[in-house]
Amino acid sequence: LQVKHAKVWTLRSMIRTDILLRAIPWAKLILRTRTAPGTLNLRPAQRWSVALTGIALALAVASPVAPFLLLPAGAALIGILALNASFYRFLCEVRGIPFALAGVFLHLLYFTCCGLGAAWTLLGGGGDLERKGV
């Protein structure tokens, strides 16, 4: 049996889904139960990737006033690439370098969404944003 998934994904819908329907509910669940269920993708490499993505973004944003911050931002990015090298290598082997580069970008975007959802929840947000039209 073969079926076609007919959902149309845009970058906006992916970001919205990753934050509102994944990151925030997972963060709420972890805070409520004080444990990370084994079914969630929360291996140490992924946790480090989210943290390093946040660090890299914060340093990059601050770099116009302190250009020396680009060096540690680059180091954080290299750390993310190293932590996920086997996945990126797989993307390259399956579909080539352009596909792998797009995969790296989307993976970084995913880590950013995870971090934003977790931060939002930890800061007391995470209410029912879906109903509010966010």
Which stretches of residues belong to each language-model region?
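Generic hydrophobic/packing signal
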Residues: 1, 22-25, 29, 46-47, ...
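Catalytic donor/gating beta->alpha subdomain of glycosyltransferases that bind UDP-sugars
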Residues: 1-38
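Short, hydrophobic secondary-structure boundary micro-motifs
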Residues: 5-6, 38-42, 100-101, 131-132
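Helix N-terminus capping/helix-initiation residues
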Residues: 10, 42-43, 96
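A loop-to-helix transmembrane entry motif
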Residues: 15, 36-54
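Membrane-embedded multi-pass helical conduit in multi-pass membrane proteins
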Residues: 50-126
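Short linear elements at protein peripheries
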Residues: 126-134
